Amino acid sequence: MKLKLFPFQAAGHGQVLVSEDDKILIKPCIKSEVDFYKTCNDNITLYNWIPKNFGEWMPSSRDIEGINPIAESVAFSLTGKAIILENILYQMETPCVMDIKLGKQLWADDAPLEKRKRLDAVSRSTTSGSLGFRITGILSWDRTNNTYIKRSTAWGKTLTDSDVVEGLNDFFVSCSLSQKARLVESFLNLLKLFEVDLSESYIELKSSSILFVYDYSSLNPTYHCESNVVLKLIDLAHSRWTKNTIDHNTLIGVKNLIHCFAMLLKNE
């Protein structure tokens, strides 16, 4: 399996690789994320919200022979763990991607004290603390210049309660008013469904994210199809199933996201 750099990574720490046929991703991770994915099967309520996984990636020389030097160096640097995931952008011509981190508390219970202090400071100074969510990256299509506009994690940290809706609007920067309204409505409906499923799941999701995706190339003035509108739960390294505990820390962020998307829709 030949690999290349994944060009649509909106946020995250490790460089993701993608197969030459664009069907699967190789995502660097830690052991706890590999272990958590092993517990995700079609018997769980959140199954459809989690990208399909195909097990742990065990690299061989065949995986990286012949790819460009940058991707080769990345692949060789994966001395730890990596997991094989479906590429939810597969067959999208112009995917637009937004990564949003959920929760006011951003650290797992086993995090050392210094990490807790650092992440608590991040939460207090951003919308993570006030709203329970924070935009960590956006890749949106700029039709005027025929290129992508990127919004970074650092940019997301500058947003406040008063302008975060405007920040969300950047995800739809090249859409017409009607396209944007229908996309926002589609994502709003998905968020409401996700909220219901999450509220019925005994799970703890610390520092997880929601990935929003749509294909700009599929839009047209009469757009009404949701097949290229995707919402997925990602970054599950610090997730665990619980016996009888609902994750209110994450739900706060989801509820506020629903409110903000409703405001986006109302503004149209």
Swiss-Prot record:
Example GO molecular function: ATP binding
Assigned keywords, A-Z: ATP-binding, Cytoplasm, Kinase, Nucleotide-binding, Nucleus, Transcription, Transcription regulation, Transferase
GO CC, one annotated term: nucleus
Top-level taxon of origin: Eukaryota
Disulfide bonds: none
Annotated positions binding substrate: 127-135
InterPro entries from the UniProt entry: IPK, IPK_sf
Catalyzed reactions per annotation: 1D-myo-inositol 1,4,5-trisphosphate + 2 ATP = 1D-myo-inositol 1,3,4,5,6-pentakisphosphate + 2 ADP + 2 H(+); 1D-myo-inositol 1,4,5-trisphosphate + ATP = 1D-myo-inositol 1,4,5,6-tetrakisphosphate + ADP + H(+); 1D-myo-inositol 1,4,5-trisphosphate + ATP = 1D-myo-inositol 1,3,4,5-tetrakisphosphate + ADP + H(+); 1D-myo-inositol 1,4,5,6-tetrakisphosphate + ATP = 1D-myo-inositol 1,3,4,5,6-pentakisphosphate + ADP + H(+)
Localization of this protein: Cytoplasm; Nucleus
Gene3D superfamilies associated with the record: Inositol polyphosphate kinase
Residues reported in the UniProt entry to bind ATP: 27, 86-88, 99, 235
This enzyme's EC code(s): 2.7.1.127, 2.7.1.151
GO biological process, one term: inositol phosphate biosynthetic process
Pfam families: IPK
Family designation: Belongs to the inositol phosphokinase (IPK) family.
Protein's job: Inositol phosphate kinase with both monophosphoinositol and diphosphoinositol polyphosphate synthase activities. Able to phosphorylate inositol 1,4,5-trisphosphate (Ins(1,4,5)P3) on both the carbon-3 and carbon-6 positions to synthesize inositol 1,3,4,5-tetrakisphosphate (Ins(1,3,4,5)P4) and inositol 1,4,5,6-tetrakisphosphate (Ins(1,4,5,6)P4), and then to subsequently phosphorylate and convert either isomer of InsP4 to inositol 1,3,4,5,6-pentakisphosphate (Ins(1,3,4,5,6)P5). Also converts (Ins(1,3,4,5,6)P5) to InsP6. Also has a role in transcription regulation.
Protein name, per record: Inositol polyphosphate multikinase
Organism of this sequence: Schizosaccharomyces pombe (strain 972 / ATCC 24843) (Fission yeast)
